[in-house]
A protein has these predicted regions:
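UBL (ubiquitin/ubiquitin-like) substrate-recognition surfaces
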Residues: 2, 12, 21-368
């Protein structure tokens, strides 16, 4: 995909809902853009389906659109250090212009490094690893410290793990985020967690961590749920149970004394504007189907004192079909659309059509 210096920037006049560019129409329902495609110069087209599904899902968020829009004055002077940002700009420029966006250049510049890093992964988890890797790179390229007196030693401060004063920890993480994490990724996708570790032999220890993506290990969660509630063995997991397993107290070995009765409790200190949930299925013993809602509230899992407004709605879902290919279902302008390879269709029975395949990634967006 060639980047033309004489861009027609009219598409940047689109409003935040991107309502004035339409390429698909069915029963008077319109969709603002076409599927991302991959040309045949990619050796294995099947491998590109999870990449295109992730990119298509990200493109549906207004924060990504506004970020790309803000780059229009910078893109002509982007250096080699911003290679991925530049390729994303080129790709999303075509997408937001109402054209077919070809991901070939993006994949050729990115895919080999990704495959090398994750060469031993389970292929069914590719969207999760790819998104995590992409977030890392975009964050690194977009990161701009706000404070000119930023102290880089904060990044490696041992007090992030060892300091036991909860409020000092919080202040340290706040400073860390403000000074070194000001990017499109940290501003919209970072979840900050508080971990309370309780051990019979050691003092309680509180520390923070942050993650782009919440990972639910469905096989383990179903095993825990079934052992705790044997009468539910024939029932699907639901998202509430997954959050309970993720945040609840699971016995593990204490890092300090080796006590096997240690329990770890996790709470959201800050929840992201866009909550990305990876559904990991190993399919060893438990084959896990998951029930999830289009609207969700995580108030029960927030740290005490946080404002009671964390209501999310399902914006996008990436799934794997019976042919081993990925597709994305995206909620746009009040309707659900399925993007699969070069095809775009509207979903009529959303509750059935979204749940009939194995979801791999769920994208929940915070309600205004």
């Amino acid at each position: 995909m060639n980047n033309n210096n004489n861009f027609n920037m009219n598409f940047f006049n689109m409003n935040n809902n991107m309502n004035n560019q339409f390429n698909f129409q069915q029963n008077n329902i319109q969709c603002p853009y076409k599927p991302i495609i991959t040309n045949t110069n990619i050796k294995d087209i099947n491998e590109s389906t999870f990449i295109n599904s992730v990119l298509q899902s990200l493109a549906s968020f207004n924060c990504i659109y506004n970020w790309i829009k803000s780059k229009n004055q910078q893109v002509l002077t982007m250096t080699q250090n911003l290679k991925i940002t530049k390729e994303l700009y080129n790709l999303f420029y075509f997408l937001y212009s109402g054209q077919f966006a070809d991901s070939s250049n993006f994949i050729l510049n990115f895919f080999n490094a990704f495959k090398y890093k994750y060469q031993n992964i389970n292929l069914k988890q590719d969207p999760y690893h790819f998104l995590f890797y992409l977030f890392d790179i975009i964050h690194s390229e977009d990161n701009s410290p706000l404070n000119p007196n930023y102290d880089a030693t904060i990044l490696n401060s041992q007090s992030l793990v060892t300091q036991r004063n909860k409020f000092s920890m919080r202040n340290l993480f706040t400073k860390f985020l403000e000074q070194s994490q000001n990017s499109i990724i940290s501003n919209n996708f970072y979840n900050i967690f508080g971990h309370e570790i309780k051990c019979n032999n050691c003092p309680s220890l509180f520390y923070d961590s942050f993650k782009y993506i919440i990972k639910f290990k469905l096989d383990d969660y179903k095993k825990y749920r079934d052992e705790a509630y044997p009468n539910k063995k024939n029932e699907n997991l639901n998202l509430d149970e997954c959050f309970e397993c993720f945040t609840g107290g699971n016995n593990s070995q204490c890092n300090n004394c080796g006590n096997l009765q240690r329990k770890t409790f996790i709470s959201f200190v800050r929840s992201a504007k866009i909550l990305v949930i990876a559904l990991i299925r190993m399919n060893h013993i438990y084959k896990c189907d998951l029930d999830f809602k289009n609207k969700y509230n995580i108030n029960a899992f927030l740290e005490y004192g946080i404002a009671n407004y964390k209501n999310y709605f399902l914006k996008a879902c990436i799934s794997l079909n019976n042919q081993g290919k990925y597709f994305s279902d995206i909620f746009i302008n009040g309707f659900w659309f399925r993007f699969y390879e070069n095809n775009l269709s509207m979903l009529n029975n959303v509750n059935v059509e979204i749940h009939q395949y194995e979801p791999q990634l769920l994208f929940y967006e915070l309600e205004n």
